[in-house]
């Protein structure tokens, strides 16, 4: 203790000031160190922040504090003339940066009309526009079955869940939804989160924190939620070039197979429409001993015979014939360790989820703060989401109609020479290449043509690749598409925006006008597009009845 006191006197100016000898320090320690520590500006704050195992202090703690309390004269008082930090000034400076680089966001007041989809009104209900950029890909937000299910549920169970899943917020709606999601992806378990942003952040950060020496490999175009989760994981990470599997393998080869590794990527990248080679990524994961973390946010509902996403689509026939059962052979869907996705796009409501093995789901359920310490989704939301997942599973025609409308728009824009970034998916990214012009193009579409298409600028996309992002749905008929095409042609003429030939004259960009670019074939083949709901397995037309044990907790 003498050694500790000597060290304290050397390090702490407070100790050296209030003690004239080491004997005094020793006496201080033995008699009244607690009271003296309260006079130290550092220790006073540290002692005020007491920790307890429970959420509240143990009984008697407050009384003990009162018994030890003594009148304290502050040792150090700040000068009354010292200026307060200019908080508003900092906020304004940061906002001005975004205005100057054209990344400041303006929100459009868009109120989508369920009975007039894809119409919406702005501030005034008579001021109507056609929405062409919603992520409600299959229009389930206004599906009659979904809305009726939500109405019945809210009438019976009220507006909110009442708490976290651990405290009063766990119910049959959560269990039914998780059973449907696990069945959709043919995984042992599923776990519902308040959003897929939260799911990605919670799962990735937890795995990094719990696995010793984990290394994460992330596609450079991954969503902000995955980037945030990887940052919170606080582990070694490598960013591989977008869809560049040679680069990914070079990075994986740097580490022994026994070291924990995870590859994080998306199936469909929402701002470009590019698609990952999931099969080859699984090959690399197995070769180098890595887990696979696949975000299917922009593909669930849209790909595969049952809407499970691109991983299912890659073995389309095997899954179509097997229905809810797993095919006899190993599929890409089997090989992906973790799938995350959203309830807020193709399924029309809100929320996110993880589908994985029972042990992994139970691990996340038991340890992830982003799941544990947040209120459960409302019963009506979960019931409506389960109804949407079930209904779309047997609605092959909706997926096909969305693909047909997308193809019509892409072909029409191509005929006009309007530059669409080529891709094999349902996304229609129209290249502008300038943030101010992209914003003006969006404004003209809205004000002159009553068409809402959002401009996409930095930081969502790299500078110089600014674009308009169009997302046709089953509700966007060919007649509506013709109106859009005429409006786009007018905007390109008005603003004298570069067409495909103009991009080609400068060497091209992002596949637009690039002389050696070879476009990928669409994910949906003509044979798949010719199928009907009658070609689906009978098992997909019945809801999943059995709840998952992992949803409530597995009994030892």
UniProtKB/Swiss-Prot annotation:
Keyword field contains Manganese: no
Modified residues (N6-(pyridoxal phosphate)lysine): 345
GO molecular function: 5-aminolevulinate synthase activity; pyridoxal phosphate binding
Top EC class for this record: transferase
BP-aspect Gene Ontology terms: heme biosynthetic process; positive regulation of organelle assembly; protoporphyrinogen IX biosynthetic process
Active site, UniProt feature: 345
Residues holding pyridoxal 5'-phosphate: 270, 298, 342, 374-375
Binding site for substrate: 105, 218, 237, 460
Transit peptide: 1-46
Keyword Ligase on entry: no
Annotated localization: Mitochondrion matrix
Disulfide bonds: none
Cofactor(s) needed: pyridoxal 5'-phosphate
Pathway: Porphyrin-containing compound metabolism; protoporphyrin-IX biosynthesis; 5-aminolevulinate from glycine: step 1/1
GO cellular component, one term: mitochondrion
Entry keywords, A to Z: Acyltransferase, Heme biosynthesis, Mitochondrion, Pyridoxal phosphate, Transferase, Transit peptide
Subunit structure: Homodimer.
Similarity comment text for this entry: Belongs to the class-II pyridoxal-phosphate-dependent aminotransferase family.
Role description: Catalyzes the synthesis of 5-aminolevulinate (ALA) from succinyl-CoA and glycine, the first and rate-limiting step in heme biosynthesis.
PANTHER family recorded: 2-AMINO-3-KETOBUTYRATE COENZYME A LIGASE, MITOCHONDRIAL, CLASS II AMINOTRANSFERASE/8-AMINO-7-OXONONANOATE SYNTHASE
Protein name according to UniProt: 5-aminolevulinate synthase, mitochondrial
Native organism: Eremothecium gossypii (strain ATCC 10895 / CBS 109.51 / FGSC 9923 / NRRL Y-1056) (Yeast)
């Amino acid at each position: 203790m003498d050694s500790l006191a000597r060290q304290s006197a050397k390090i702490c100016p407070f100790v050296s000031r209030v003690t004239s000898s080491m004997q005094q320090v020793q006496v201080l320690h033995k008699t009244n160190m607690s009271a003296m520590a309260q006079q130290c500006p550092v220790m006073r704050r540290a002692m005020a922040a007491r920790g307890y195992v429970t959420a509240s202090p143990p009984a008697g703690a407050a009384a003990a504090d009162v018994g030890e309390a003594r009148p304290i004269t502050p040792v150090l008082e700040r000068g009354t003339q010292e200026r307060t930090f200019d908080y508003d000034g900092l906020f304004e400076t940061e906002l001005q940066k975004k205005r100057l680089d054209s990344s400041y966001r303006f929100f459009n007041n868009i109120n989508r009309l369920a009975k007039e989809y894809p119409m919406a009104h702005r501030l005034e209900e008579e001021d109507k526009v056609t929405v062409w950029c919603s992520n409600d890909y299959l229009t389930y937000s206004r599906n009659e079955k979904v809305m009726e299910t939500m109405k019945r549920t809210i009438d019976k169970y009220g507006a909110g869940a009442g708490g976290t899943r651990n405290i009063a917020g766990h119910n049959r709606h959560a269990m039914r939804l998780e059973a449907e999601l696990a069945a959709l992806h043919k995984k042992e378990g599923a776990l519902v989160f308040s959003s897929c942003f939260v799911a990605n952040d919670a799962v990735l950060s937890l795995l990094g924190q719990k696995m010793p020496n984990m290394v994460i490999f992330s596609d450079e175009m991954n969503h902000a939620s995955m980037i945030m989760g990887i940052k919170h994981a606080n582990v070694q990470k490598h960013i591989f070039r977008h869809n560049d599997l040679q680069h990914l393998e070079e990075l994986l080869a740097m580490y022994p197979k026994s070291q924990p590794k995870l590859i994080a990527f998306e199936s469909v990248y929402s701002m470009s429409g590019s698609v990952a080679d999931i099969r080859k990524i699984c090959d690399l994961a197995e070769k180098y001993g890595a887990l696979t973390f696949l975000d299917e946010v922009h593909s669930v509902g849209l790909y595969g015979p049952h809407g499970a996403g691109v991983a299912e689509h890659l073995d389309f026939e095997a899954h179509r014939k097997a229905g809810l059962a797993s095919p006899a052979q190993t599929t890409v869907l089997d090989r992906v360790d973790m799938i995350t996705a959203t309830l807020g796009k193709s399924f029309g409501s809100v929320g996110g989820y993880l589908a994985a093995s029972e042990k992994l789901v139970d691990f996340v359920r038991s340890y992830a703060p982003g799941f544990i310490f947040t209120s459960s989704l409302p019963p009506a939301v979960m019931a409506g989401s389960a109804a949407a997942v079930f209904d779309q599973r047997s609605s092959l025609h909706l997926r096909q109609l969305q693909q047909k409308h997308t193809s019509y728009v892409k072909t029409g824009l191509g005929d006009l020479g309007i530059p669409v970034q080529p891709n094999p998916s349902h996304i229609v990214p129209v290249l502008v290449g300038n943030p101010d012009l992209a914003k003006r193009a969006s404004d003209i579409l809205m004000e002159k043509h009553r068409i809402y298409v959002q401009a996409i600028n930095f930081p969502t996309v790299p500078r110089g690749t600014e674009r308009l992002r169009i997302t046709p749905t089953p509700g966007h008929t060919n007649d509506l598409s013709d109106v859009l095409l005429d409006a786009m042609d007018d905007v390109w003429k008005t603003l004298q925006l570069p067409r495909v030939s103009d991009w080609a004259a400068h060497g091209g960009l992002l596949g637009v006008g690039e002389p050696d670019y070879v476009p990928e074939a669409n994910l949906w083949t003509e044979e798949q597009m010719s199928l009907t709901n009658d070609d689906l397995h009978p098992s997909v037309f019945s809801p999943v009845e059995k709840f998952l044990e992992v949803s409530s907790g597995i009994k030892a």
